[in-house]
Amino acid sequence: MLCCVPNRAHRRHHWLVVTSAFLLAAGATVAATRHESGSVAGAGVSAGATASAKPTGSSGTKLQFGLDYSDTLTFASTSTMNTSLADAVHMGAQYIRVDLAWEDYQSTSANFAPDFARFDRVVDAASAHGLKVLATIDLPPVWARESGCSDTPACPPASDAAFADFAAEAAARYAPRGLHDWEVWNEPNISAWDPRPDPSAYAALLTATSKAIHNVDSQAYVMMGGLAAQQAHPGTPYISAADFIADVGKAGGLADAQAVAYHPYPGQSNAAASATIEAIDGSPDNMVAALSKAGYPKMPIWITETGAGVPGVLKGSTSAAEIAKEEQQQAQTATSLVQTLARTPNVAAMFWFDDQDQISARLVYGLRTASGTVRPALAALAKAIAANRK
């Protein structure tokens, strides 16, 4: 039984808003805040993962593709949900990424079983459209948050075992419906883990949750939560993706993960020149090097969020011509991201954020405008994805 819906203004998009404001002001795009059971596997990859995504010449790896909806589908009408999922199909996606926030399904207490009715709708609708679901599990309800931390969903759980039990209950429910892919937390290397990132604590949560999910689903594929890629700035707790991987690895957290998720937003139409993309394998201290040092040189990296914004729509003075130019740049970035990530070591999947602008949250990365008009980026993604599959 679910008594109430928590205040969504403080949900995952809260961190997207904070970082969006910072980066859009600098003229960049947001860098804040899922696999087929047979995607790229590597050293230390647990049971259930096999190797299938392989280099294919000049076009690079044949990637998995997805569209990220955060929690918008969870609360959408049936007609809105169907329109949104049709965009994923048009784009050529195999997956959608959706939040499974614990606080939405068991908000009252542990004495009431989770009510998964809302998520049932999403999973069933995705299946009807031929799409798989990557679920991001996070956001403990108030009663389950760490002592002394109860005013933000970013609070870690008071009990890793309780969080893992909730995850296992969800996995047992959805495995028969074809949902096997899980991302544990969203951006634990920034303020989305309150009050500051804690690699050791996150490693313990990842281990407990992955073991619990695998106990009920032998086909499960569990990812280390999508790591934020933005640069540190004053007043914001932040650990780089590579350093966070290294620290989680030292704490033993990678042993039960099948992949690492990452959220690079290039901020320019040439994705290959972006520092957030270079951080995967091109910078001195990069993610692939960190994985290799930790003993997992071939662990897949899933880009479970990336995209490009159209910031002009937030400025009342921006002309239609200027917005059209920004939309063309967004489309160019979409093409460049597919081509660049397909050539980037370890990368196995790319998810675009997001389907439609959310003006009230200042999130303007949609394949559609807030009013529903389709942007050129949707066609650009569809063309680039089709080319990647040849």
Please tell me what each predicted stretch does.
Residues 10-34:
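Secretory targeting and sorting signals
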Residues 91-236, 267, 297, 308, ...:
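Substrate-binding cleft and catalytic face of glycoside hydrolase catalytic domains
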Residues 65, 94, 177-180, 258, ...:
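Short acidic/polar active-site loop segments enriched in Thr and Asp
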Residues 60, 78, 160, 164, ...:
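Noncatalytic carbohydrate-binding groove/subsite architecture in carbohydrate-active enzymes
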